[in-house]
Amino acid sequence: SVVITPTGFSKESDWLQYGGDEGGSRYSKLNQINTLNVKDLEVAWTYKTGHLDRIPEQLSFLRKLVGFQVTPIILPDDVGGNLVFCTPFNEVIALNAATGQQVWFYDPKIDLRPFAGRFNCRGLAQWRNPEKTLSEVCSHSLYLAASDKRLIALDAKTGVPCPEFGSQGIVNVLPYIKNIEPTNQIKAMQLKSPP
C-alpha cells in the first residue's frame, strides 16, 4: 500500500464511499500523482490480512474460491481518519492510514462450509447519524453486506456492532429475499458489494 498524506485533507479529496463519491464515479480530482512521477513512489507500509491462514486444513479447497477485490475507504478525521476495508471472509479491518498499524478488527464469524460460491467482499458503506453526537456509540457507522446474507452495522471508531441496528448490530436479510425468482437460487446467492 502506498500512502500519500498531503496536509489539509478535504472531503473532496477523501475516498469516503465505495465508488469514491456518492455517485460512484471512481474519479479523484487529486493530481499529486501523475504519469511522470508514479515511478518514483515508494512503499510506505504493507499489511497482511491473514485471511487465508484462518482457513481450516479440512477446508483448504476454499483457497481457490477466494477473491480479494475490495475498495478501501477512508473515515473522516473526526472518527479516526482510518483506512477501512473487508476481507473475502467479511472480516472488517481499520488501519491507521499513515502507519498501517491495525486499529481494530471485526470478525463476523461466517460459516465457510455451506457456500458454493466464491468468497469476496468488495467494500463497506459508511453513514453519519445526524441525530447523534460524535461521542455517542455508532454516531458514525460502517455497513457490511456479509456473504451469509446478514447486514451488519459497526461503530466506525471501534468496530463494535451497533446495538440499535437490528439485533445487536445484525439484520438477517434472508427473510426479505425468500421471494426472489428463481427461488431455487437463493442458497447460491451471496452478498458481496457494499450496501
Predicted regions and their residues:
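Beta-rich strand-turn-strand
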Residues: D148, G159-V160
